[in-house]
C-alpha cells in the first residue's frame, strides 16, 4: 500500500497533519488530507480516518477502498487504533500486519442509498405515536411506537444497543429490527436473516434517517442487504470481544 488518504474530524486537524508528515517521511504518497467530501471517489490504496464512529461512517459512504480508523471520539467501535498510536500503525503498515474485517451494507431501494449502521424511521417530537407494519418472507409484524430501526451487525453496538437491541458479532449474517419507544412492553427486538427483503409501512409520513443523515419524510420503504461491502483493516491481534468489554463493560470478568 503506497497511495494513502487521510480523512479527519475538523477538530483533529493537527493530528492529521502530524500523521501526514510521518507518512511522507517514510516514503508513502499521501494523495489527500481532508475533512470535507472532496475525498469522494478518490482512488487510493487505503483511507486513514481520524475521528469517532460518525467520521468513520461518513468516510464509508465517500470511498470504496479499505479504511483504517484512529479513535478521536468517545467509543470508536470502528477504530483500530487511538490517535496516540501512530508509531504502532506505521510499524503494522510497513509489515502489512493487518487482517481485513469485512462489513456489509443495507440498501434502501427507494433512494438507492446505502447504510452501514442503521436505517431509522421515526416521528417528529410533536407527532402522535404511529402504527408500523413490517413484512418479509416469513410473515408480518405490527408495532405502535415512535418509530422503527433496522440495524446491521456493525450498527448493533450503536443506537440499536441504546434501544435495547442485541450485540451481533460483525460476521453475523443477520440484521436487527427494533421498535423505538413501543407502547407495549412485549415489543422487543427481533433478529432476522440478512437475505430477507423488508418492507416497512407507516400510517403517517415520518423522518427517514440513514446513518445519522435525515433524508426527509417517508411512509413506506424497502430495505435489503446490499452487495456493497467495505474492508476495515485491523491489527492481527484485534479482538472484538475485548473491544466490547473495554468500551461497554459487557462480558467483563469481575472477579
Curated annotation (Swiss-Prot):
Enzyme class per UniProt: transferase
Record keywords: ATP-binding, Cytoplasm, Kinase, NAD, NADP, Nucleotide-binding, Transferase
Primary site of residence: cytoplasm
Protein's cellular compartments: Cytoplasm
Keyword hit for Kinase: yes
GO molecular function list: ATP binding; metal ion binding; NAD binding; NAD+ kinase activity
HAMAP family cross-referenced by the UniProt entry: NAD_kinase
Stated family: Belongs to the NAD kinase family.
Record protein name field: NAD kinase
Organism: Thermosipho africanus (strain TCF52B)
Lineage: Bacteria, Thermotogati, Thermotogota, Thermotogae, Thermotogales
Gene that this sequence comes from: nadK
